[in-house]
């Protein structure tokens, strides 16, 4: 059994939302967004206390099943430390089940809090590994851990037994690029949306997406003029349009007007990456149809402050 962390030590975490895929980079590209959840984890004498306000309040479990708690416990175990008890408080602004990385943010917050309580013994890639384990892919978690843009990948062991190895590397984002999120007033299940995807795609479509993913990395870092071309996709958005017709309508409409729009993660949120704001008339129309429209900057990495 490892060292026990003293009662009273507290980790306060600010974790960003994220968007994944960015059009062609399915389960590969991610981007941290300036919308945040805040988590405080304090060591107490015994037991577990969980409090949630904001997004998810009254909907998520307030016990060991809570994702922040699960990720925090996993991190403490990896760091070989223990706690007599925990008080976890979450103040959430990231909409849940909307394609903005709420679950990855929760996992990242738990990992960051655990790492802070343990004395910052784990490096960034170790934190990406633990957080991604709860996701099954590292694009969102990588973005929340590292900030800015990320290229991510997964190495799946051939023995079929060992755990996958998740990796992410940061891409600095051109300072002129901003995000506009069009957030519909309904949820989407990532698992359900993934089920509509075919098991195979054509070589032509695969080649198309490989090239546009490469273009997108250049667009993000150096050349925002390439954002429209870099967000083109033939791998997943067409299939998901069948179950997200409102989202598909807005993606197509925005793109036809020249905006680099795409499905954010599994949706239903639509994201535009550009150097210019979206026309106010479109924004007001979207709001009139029940959408929340947020102008977001590109975020830095998860932040942790430890006291006690």
Curated annotation (Swiss-Prot):
Compartments in which it is found: Cytoplasm
Swiss-Prot/TrEMBL GO biological process terms: threonine biosynthetic process
UniProt cross-references to InterPro entries, sorted A to Z: GHMP_kinase_C_dom, GHMP_kinase_C_sf, GHMP_kinase_N_dom, GHMP_knse_ATP-bd_CS, Homoserine_kinase, Ribosomal_Su5_D2-typ_SF, Ribsml_uS5_D2-typ_fold_subgr
Annotated EC: 2.7.1.39
Its job: Catalyzes the ATP-dependent phosphorylation of L-homoserine to L-homoserine phosphate.
Catalyzed reaction equations: L-homoserine + ATP = O-phospho-L-homoserine + ADP + H(+)
The protein, known as: Homoserine kinase
Top-level enzyme category: transferase
One cellular-component annotation, GO: cytoplasm
Metabolic or biological pathway, per its Swiss-Prot or TrEMBL entry: Amino-acid biosynthesis; L-threonine biosynthesis; L-threonine from L-aspartate: step 4/5
GO MF, one annotated term: homoserine kinase activity
Residues where ATP binds: 95-105
Keywords assigned by UniProt, alphabetized: Amino-acid biosynthesis, ATP-binding, Cytoplasm, Kinase, Nucleotide-binding, Threonine biosynthesis, Transferase
Species assigned in the record: Corynebacterium jeikeium (strain K411)
HAMAP family registered for this protein in UniProt: Homoser_kinase
